[in-house]
Amino acid sequence: MPASMFSIDNILAARPRCKDAVLPVAPSAAAPVVFPALHGDSLYGAGGGTSSDYGAFYPRPVAPGGAGLPAAVGSSRLGYNSYFYGQLHVQAAPVGPACCGAVPPLGAQQCSCVPTPPGYEGPGSVLVSPVPHQMLPYMNVGTLSRTELQLLNQLHCRRKRRHRTIFTDEQLEALENLFQETKYPDVGTREQLARKVHLREEKVEVWFKNRRAKWRRQKRSSSEESENAEKWNKTSSKASPEKREEEGKSDLDSDS
């Protein structure tokens, strides 16, 4: 490397001025959040243009023991139509020229439902969770703001709805019979019933919780109906003597 590159004139000429300084942004068309199929090649390997294209924006994390990126995130990347997408490590170092002050970096944000691969820990970085494949062709990590990254993680970490268990008629009959005997069966009774109807004990426990809630609602509604009926009977009984008096007066008027 020529020594003239380290001269004071070259260093000062390469430094951007405050007025002309432009914040570095990721290329919009050259760096979408889609990785072509590498076929075993390293993402940061020397072959091809991958290292030169992404090296400035996605520094190479080193896993414990000297393992590179393929060993760290190779198992976390998902394949879809010859594309790999997974956990993207976006460098959030302070940007902007030194003379104007740097923008504070993003804190370490990580989706709690996605395991962190080795080599991806550390402050000053944001871990973007896997996103649906429908969004990949239209996304660019370099253009996402701090709020958008947080919303993306929240969208991915949204709790999925559990599958509802469908019970057969025989299972429902056995569960209902035990419920009529006792509203709060112990663990041994639940396990015995679970083996009998070919269910897990957790499913039986959840069914009893839901059945008790339904039973309490029915009991509450029936008590309210009985109270309303009593109130109606009282009002009707109070009104009946008055009606009799009115009927008697009407009879006397008709006789006269």
UniProtKB/Swiss-Prot annotation:
One of its GO terms (cellular component) is nucleoplasm. Keywords: Developmental protein, DNA-binding, Homeobox, Nucleus. Residues 240-256 have a biased composition (Basic and acidic residues). Residues 160-219 bind DNA. GO terms for biological process: anatomical structure morphogenesis; dorsal/ventral neural tube patterning; ear development; embryonic skeletal system morphogenesis; forebrain development; middle ear morphogenesis; muscle organ morphogenesis; negative regulation of transcription by RNA polymerase II. Residues 213-256 are annotated as: Disordered. It holds the Pfam family Homeodomain. CDD domains: homeodomain. Induction: By activin. PANTHER family: HOMEOBOX PROTEIN GOOSECOID, HOMEOBOX PROTEIN GOOSECOID-RELATED. This is Homeobox protein goosecoid. It comes from Mus musculus (Mouse).
